[in-house]
Curated annotation (Swiss-Prot):
Protein's recorded name: Uncharacterized response regulatory protein SERP2406
Keyword Phosphoprotein: yes
Gene3D superfamilies the UniProt entry points to: 3.40.50.2300, Homeodomain-like
Matching CDD domains: REC_YesN-like (cd17536)
Localization annotation: Cytoplasm
Biological source species: Staphylococcus epidermidis (strain ATCC 35984 / DSM 28319 / BCRC 17069 / CCUG 31568 / BM 3577 / RP62A)
Length: 251
């Protein structure tokens, strides 16, 4: 549902951030990249992202100038910088950026920031019923680490195998725990059943594929539903709209 724009004149950095960060786990279904501030500004105006990650030193339009251009927009900013960019960083302080990250980017640090940001985004007042449905559907997926070993192992199995036609038994067999204990413990810690979590996670993953304009029957197969009808049923169950309605809304 959320969108992010990554702006850096070094291709290896912007593509690295795009590919290495598990954006969908943080509800960012669309990731755009730009090689300078001019490209970024065009993308920002066109797509209205919730998050912009930008370098400071860039050709044509630097990061500080970009911040000036988007200061009135409702989006969060993370600045990328080198050790010798302190003067530029001071100039960006007035824009109340979300955080600063030094290059090379520590992905663990970035994911910690994203974890906090996505909770903040999902806690915002909802402007439409569709936003509220999204919040309700994916709220249980926000927490990605629990105190219980078996719960964390089940979550890991879901994220590795959601695209397959798996059962609860398939997910817990590698963990060496009884089915009844696993189901009871998961429900106690997460608040929903393993099957419910699996289906919500599949629907979350399907949003990224919908944004890429895959056919709906292809998406159903790619996220692990045995039938197209089951994909549509669960999509409407959680988001209160059909996949086709979602496509229309996203245009």
């Amino acid at each position: 549902m959320f969108k992010v724009i990554i702006c850096d004149d070094e291709r290896i950095i912007r593509e690295g951030l795009k590919q290495m960060v598990p954006w969908e786990d943080y509800h960012f279904t669309t990731v755009y990249t730009a090689k300078d501030g001019v490209e970024a500004l065009s993308l920002i105006r066109q797509h209205q992202p919730e998050l912009v990650i930008t370098d400071i030193r860039m050709p044509r339009k630097n990061g500080v100038d970009l911040l000036d251009d988007i200061k009135d927009l409702d989006c969060q900013i993370i600045i990328l910088s080198s050790y010798d960019d302190f003067e530029y960083m001071k100039a960006g302080i007035q824009h109340h950026v979300l955080d600063y990250l030094l290059k090379p980017v520590d992905h663990t640090q970035l994911e910690h920031i994203l974890d906090i940001l996505v909770q903040r985004l999902l806690e915002r007042p909802h402007s439409t019923n569709d936003d509220a449905a999204y919040h309700t559907a994916f709220q249980p997926l926000l927490k990605i680490d629990y105190d219980d070993y078996y719960v964390n192992q089940i979550l890991s199995q879901i994220k590795q195998h959601y695209h397959k036609k798996v059962t609860v038994l398939d997910l817990i067999n590698p963990i060496d725990v009884s089915e009844s204990y696993a189901m009871r413990t998961f429900k106690e810690h997460v608040g929903i059943t393993i099957v419910d979590y699996l289906n919500r996670y599949r629907i979350l993953k399907s949003l990224h594929l919908l944004d890429q304009h895959y056919k709906h029957y292809e998406i159903a197969e790619k996220v692990g539903f045995s039938e197209y009808k089951m994909f549509c049923y669960h999509f409407k169950k959680y988001l209160h709209m059909s996949p086709s309605d979602y496509n229309k809304q996203s245009k």
